[in-house]
Amino acid sequence: MKRNAIARIIIWSLVAVLLASLLVVGISSSPSSFFTGDWSSGIIGVTYKNSARYNVGGGTVTDEFHSIKVNWTNGKINIEAYDGEDTVISETEVAEKENKLRWRVEDGVLKIQQMAAGMRFGLKQTPKKTLTVKIPSNVAEGLKAVTSDSVSAEVTITGISASDKIEIDTVSGGANLKNIKTEKLDIDTVSGSIKAAGEFTELESDSVSGDVTISTATPLKKLDCDSTSGNISLTIPKDSGFTLKADTVSGDISCGLPTVSESKNRRVCGNGSADFETDTVSGDLIITSAE
């Protein structure tokens, strides 16, 4: 009897340690880093600061803001400029209150979370939802920064200007940016293509299993672009000056701009002032000039 009691104590102690470990992982995780699919089992933790101060569900933003920060897990993210007067947030309709989006303006930043903060136990479905943020054109032209962090979501940004940066980070989903203006554009995706067109002077991108297609109307000052199992296509102004250092495995380099110096993995165009670095595996690098 005594041995059985000791055995039960040991077993339940191990169970308690395991549950405590899962709880710590859940608490320390954000929705963008902890979900791995449509269904999750065990303990799911969704945390962000001041969660009780967030608005529940979509709505109209009345407070002024200069930046946008989105944390989204599954579905689609659409951020776009429009001719209206108010910034409007909406999402695919969901029944459960805990699965409705949360948003608030804090220190000039419009923050959007996919769902309520808290712990979830057992088998849970992470809802695939489409987030739409419509911003008046006069506001969209004067933003400071736009950042989006997601796990399995397609990201589309249209007609947005951000003086500092636009930053997209997604694991399983592509990014499509149209008519954007920013100083720095930073896009990372593991399984998805990247498309970006507009005006920007600094570009960083990293793509695994997807093509990268970039078009900018302004000369780039810095480029750092990596692609695995995909091509990099870059369209830049014809008077661009840059020094290209390219590392490619099982791929070709094609440069449609006049070069003043050329070697196997290096090209110098114009005054060579901008720094271009690319790394491709099983993909081509194609540089063309805009008309």
Cite the ranges covered by each PLM segment.
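Short, T/G/N/S-enriched strand-turn elements that build extracellular solenoid repeat scaffolds
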Residues: 56-60, 76-81, 99-102, 131-139, ...
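Short, ordered beta-strand-loop transition motifs
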Residues: 83, 102-111, 270
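Acidic/His-rich segments in extracytoplasmic proteins that coordinate ligands and/or metal ions
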Residues: 107, 114, 127
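Beta-strand-rich solenoid/repeat architectures in extracellular/passenger domains
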Residues: 122-124, 148-149, 287-288
